[in-house]
């Protein structure tokens, strides 16, 4: 994942770090990757590049296209240059959509990658990315092994002209690979009656405690 400012402390504290050269037009760029422990002990690689990711905001920058193309190039280098072969690559929205085609293309010359599957998740079809000449969403819909959305109903809706945002024909073509997975949360883990991470536990009998939690956050 890109190491935005919110992840700098974790990156600096990481015990495992390595450098990787990422080819760009006209020159290569060196990035530092730190492996940290994520939720449940899952290792997470943080890609540090202050020029592209050391911003106040995660999204909404004028050069977002270049930023996330660079991130995709970094992932490609990790796949081809490092001793790392995932079973599945999960892509989200236009930011990592180009990797669906890249993975399929790389598999022709790299047998190790032929068994790597891609899952592309669409959160909102209206967000197609900043470059109208390169429709990354279309590429990912066409090349991904599986396509998921945020709910079964939304998966049905985007097959229609009304909600398909011009991609309904392509989505219909690939509807056998399309599935809606309902957004949700772990009610046991995030139960406000027992959650140790909030200042004041509450349930339906004392909902007013929520206001005290808001004050504690301030």
Predicted feature locations:
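Catalytic cores of nucleotide-sugar-dependent glycosyltransferases that transfer UDP/GDP/TDP-activated
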Residues: 1-218
């Amino acid at each position: 994942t890109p190491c935005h400012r919110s992840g700098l402390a974790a990156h600096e504290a990481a015990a495992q770090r390595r450098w990787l050269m990422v080819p760009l037009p006209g020159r290569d760029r060196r990035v530092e990757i730190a492996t940290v422990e994520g939720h449940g002990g899952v290792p997470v690689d943080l890609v540090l590049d202050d020029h592209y990711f050391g911003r106040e905001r995660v999204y909404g920058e004028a050069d977002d296209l270049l930023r996330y193309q660079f991130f995709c190039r970094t992932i490609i280098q990790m796949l081809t240059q490092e001793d790392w072969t995932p079973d599945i690559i999960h892509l989200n929205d236009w930011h990592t959509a180009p990797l669906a085609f890249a993975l399929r293309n790389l598999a022709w010359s790299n047998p190790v990658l032929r068994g790597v599957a891609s899952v592309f998740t669409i959160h909102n079809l209206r967000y197609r990315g900043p470059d109208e000449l390169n429709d990354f969403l279309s590429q990912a819909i066409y090349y991904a092994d599986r396509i998921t959305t945020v709910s079964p109903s939304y998966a049905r809706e985007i097959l229609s002209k009304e909600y398909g945002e011009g991609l309904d024909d392509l989505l219909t073509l690939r509807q056998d690979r399309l599935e809606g997975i309902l957004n949700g949360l772990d009610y046991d883990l995030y139960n406000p009656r027992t959650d140790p991470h909030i200042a004041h536990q509450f349930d339906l009998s004392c909902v007013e405690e929520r206001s005290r939690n808001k004050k504690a956050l301030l």
